[in-house]
Amino acid sequence: MGSVLGLCSVASWIPCLCGSAPCLLCRCCPSGNNSTVTRLIYALFLLVGVCVACVMLIPGMEEQLNKIPGFCENEKGVVPCNILVGYKAVYRLCFGLAMFYLLLSLLMIKVKSSSDPRAAVHNGFWFFKFATAVAIIIGAFFIPEGTFTTVWFYVGMAGAFCFILIQLVLLIDFAHSWNESWVEKMEEGNSRCWYAALLSATALNYLLSLVAVVLFFVYYTHPASCAENKAFISVNMLLCIGASVMSILPKIQESQPRSGLLQSSVITVYTMYLTWSAMTNEPETNCNPSLLSIIGFNTTRPIPKDGQSVQWWHPQGIIGLVLFLLCVFYSSIRTSNNSQVNKLTLTSDESTLIEDGNGRSDGSLDDGDGIHRAVDNERDGVTYSYSFFHFMLFLASLYIMMTLTNWYRYEPSREMKSQWTAVWVKISSSWIGLVLYVWTLVAPLVLTNRDFD
C-alpha cells in the first residue's frame, strides 16, 4: 500500500516536470511571479553544475575519471595527467553547461511575451531540458583532447572577463538600490539612526579597502622587484579615490541626488578584490605568495615523482565562487528601477511588473484553495530578456570553469602554472568596471537630451 501511495506521489510530479516553473516550487515556496521563479530554477541548475564540478576536483576522484576512455592516454608532462584529470573534467563539464545555455540563448532571441511558443520552452519542459544538459555534458567527456583544452582556455578567459563586467554592473545596481533604500528611510523618519548606518557601512567599506592596500604592499611587493604589482595597486587606488571624489561633486549631485560615497565604497572594495585576484595569478612566485602560506598553512598536494605541487584549495577561488553565487541569484530576483542598469542588463523596470494580488484572473497568486500559485506577469511583455539571461549564464559557466581551475593554462608538455594573460584580463576588467561606474555618474551631464530618471 505504501509503495502504491509513493508511486502516486511521484506520478503527481510528472506534469510539473513537463510544465511551467512555478509547479516545481509551488509546494515549498510562497507565491510569486512566474518570471522570478523561472530564473531561480535556472540558477539552481547552474548551482548543481558548480557542485558537481567541485566534486571533480576532490583528491581521489582521478581513479574514477581515469576510467573514461582517452582521458589520459599518450600524455607525458611535468605534472602527471592522472593528477590533473580533475581540471580536465571541470573543463568538459563547464563546456557542456555553457553549450546548453548558449543553445537556449540563441533559441530565445526576440521573445517578446509569454504567448510566444518559445516561451513555453523557457518556462517549462524541465525534465527534457535537464536531460538535454546531462546529455551534452556526458558527450563533452568523449571529446578528443587535441587542442580542446587550449582553445577552450582562451574562450573561457574571454567569457570570464565579460562575466566579471556583468558582476560589476549588478554590483553598481545593488549599491544604488542599497543607498536609495536607506536614504528613503532616513528621509521618512529616525534620520539619525539611518544616517549613522549609512555612514558606518561606507566607512567600513573604505576601511577594508585601505587595509587591503596596506597588505598588498606588504606581502605582494618587494623593494627591488614586483614593479607590476606596485603599479597595479597604486593605479587602482588612485582611480578609486578619483571615482569617490567625483561621486560627491556638486554637478554630479545636482544631476543625481542619490549618488554618493556608499556606491563608490562598494565599487572600491570590489576593485581591490580584482586587484588581489589578479596578483595571485602572477607566474613569479616571489611576488605571488598564497594566502595560506602567509598565514602559515599549506594546501598543496605533493606529487610522489619529479614534478610540481598542485594546490587544490584557492582562497581567491572560494571568494570568486561566493561572488558568483550572489551575482547569479541577485540577477534572478532583482526588480530594479535603476534605468541605466536596466538598459545594460536588458531588463524592464519595476513598473512593468504585475503587483501581487492584482485581480483574480486565471493567473492569480491564490485561487482561494490555499494552494500557492504564480502569476503570469509576462503576457503583455517579458520583464527581462530571455536571450540575455541565458547568455549571462553561458558566461557564468565559463567564469566558474576559470575560477575552479584558478585560471591555469594546461598543456601536457608544459607546467601547470598561472599566465600573465589572466593577470591582465582581471586588471583590465577592474579598469573597465571603474569606467562603467564613472559613466553612470557623468552620463546625465554628457547626454543632456536623454532622460535618465
Swiss-Prot record:
Lipidation (N-myristoyl glycine): 2
Bilayer topology annotation: Multi-pass membrane protein
Lumenal compartment segments: 61-88, 145-151, 219-231, 281-309, 409-426
A Pfam family it matches: Serinc
Transmembrane segments: 40-60, 89-109, 124-144, 152-172, 198-218, 232-252, 260-280, 310-330, 388-408, 427-447
List of residues that carry Phosphoserine: 351, 361, 364
Subcellular location, principal: endoplasmic reticulum
GO CC annotation: endoplasmic reticulum membrane; plasma membrane
Phosphothreonine sites (modified residues): 352
Keywords: Endoplasmic reticulum, Lipid biosynthesis, Lipid metabolism, Lipoprotein, Membrane, Myristate, Phospholipid biosynthesis, Phospholipid metabolism, Phosphoprotein, Transmembrane, Transmembrane helix
MF terms in GO: acetyltransferase activator activity; protein-macromolecule adaptor activity
Cytoplasmic side: 2-39, 110-123, 173-197, 253-259, 331-387, 448-453
Localization of this protein: Endoplasmic reticulum membrane
GO biological process: one example: membrane biogenesis
Lipid metabolism as UniProt keyword: yes
InterPro entries, per the entry: TDE1/TMS
Subunit structure: Interacts with SPTLC1.
Family: Belongs to the TDE1 family.
Task of the protein: Enhances the incorporation of serine into phosphatidylserine and sphingolipids.
Protein name as it appears in the record: Serine incorporator 1
Lineage: Eukaryota, Metazoa, Chordata, Craniata, Vertebrata
